[in-house]
Amino acid sequence: MTTPAKLTTGDIRGHLIGQTLPTTFGVAALMSVALLNAYYIGKLGSEELAAVAFIFPVVIALSSLGVGVMVGINSVIARSLGAGDVAQAARRANFGAVFAVAAGTALGLILYLLIGPLFRLMQASPALLPLIHEYMAPYALGLPLLLLQMALGGVLRGQGEAKVSSLIQLGYALANWALNPILITGALGFGGLGLSGAAYAMIAGNAVSCALSLLFIARTPLPINPALIRECRMGESARAIVSVAGPAALSNAVNPIGLSVLTALLASEGQAAVAGFGAAGRLQSFAVVPLLALSGSIGAIVGQNWGAGETGRARLALREAWMFCLIYGFGVGAVLFVWGDWFGSLFSQDPAVIAQFSSYMAISVWGYAGFGLLIVANGALNAVGRSSIALAQSFARVVLLMLPFAELLRGAWGAEAIYGAELFANLGGGLLAVWIAWRVLAAHKPAALA
């Protein structure tokens, strides 16, 4: 299926399109699962929805860890292939898979034992704890599968197999589309399991993803063969992956944390502001899917060329990706700016909510391009082993730009200060990320792969 380091030759723009387009469909498929979950859980009742509100931050944190593992494996494999060391790439692929299962098992057991204390610490009421346990118990035991499917995704993405990765994501989505109505609310004569059904559907989806991944990986130059683990220098392999995975996981978690703080600040501006902000955020999450896909695709292209010493091609890929961010970001922003009221009316009939929705759209959409610049820069930095810089950029965007702006101006501007804070952080963070990432890629000193 794969020619090693196939992204080190050929047209860069063609590679960007070929990697990003299928990834866009894959990301959209995953997002559809989240919407489907929300729909069926909403049919269970208000208590179940309240339980999910407590569960969501924990799931986001653990998903961020999985993304970090995927990015770390992607990075080391892409650079090894670029350097022409297929044997090392194969060792790292197999070590990464075993590492993911081991980490998932350890974390899953810890989480299972701490479900009660953790959610009591989060101030979950006694009435909600049984519902939370319904979901979190199977989720915790299924954590090894979650991290394994992320790791296998990293093996494929590091080889530039974006189309295959997207097919696997679609397989995950199809499994959930089929199982969610049956396992959550009940269908086809089955009574439904409630919240635990949502967790079991996710586990089944991850099992499908793992099976498909192993099937496709077996046809690449990096098949999963645990016997290769014996040839690895364990400590060095772990450091190579964790040095990227750790900061990447934290970087991925920073933005949701920042948005949670903004939501808390917005609560003082009234329920309509919170509702409008939340509804607009759901629309925004779909609007930026191509930017998210591009940030996930840039890694294999930059990583392989960086490992091969093709600094010029790596920088060209980054420049072309940034141009897309500017064109798409401002283009889709203009559409949402013009049609803000109409989109708002799709989410609510309350004039106050629609007004806040439109106000948020009128301000925040002009920052999409900057957000794209930042996440693409971070994807490139992770690919070349500079994930600590990517983490610093994400941290600076939220902690040094977004939150101070919102807090300082909230008294004078109200809700618009919070909307403006997101715009300021995206534009400022994006420009800073461009300056830093371009300088890093100009100095060709690849991080050691050991």
Question: Residue spans of the language-model regions?
Answer:
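Transmembrane helical elements of multi-pass membrane transporters/channels
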Residues: G18-A34, P138, Y172, G205-S209, ...
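Alpha-helical transmembrane segments of multi-pass membrane transport proteins
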Residues: G14, A29-L30, G66-V67, L107, ...
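Small-residue-rich hydrophobic transmembrane alpha-helices
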Residues: L49-L109, L146-S165, G276-G340, F371-A390
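Alpha-helical transmembrane segments of multipass membrane proteins
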Residues: L35-Y39, L109, P117, A151-V155, ...
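Helix-terminus/linker motif at the lipid-water interface of multi-pass membrane proteins
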Residues: S32-A50, F119-P126, I182-L193, A249, ...
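Short alpha-helical transmembrane segments in multi-pass integral membrane proteins
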Residues: M1-T23, I77-P144, A175, F190-G246, ...
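Short runs within selected transmembrane alpha-helices of multi-pass transporters and secretion channels
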Residues: M70, N74, Y139-G158, S165-A173, ...
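Residue-level signal for short hydrophobic patches within transmembrane helices
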Residues: R13-S32, L36, V58-L65, L141, ...
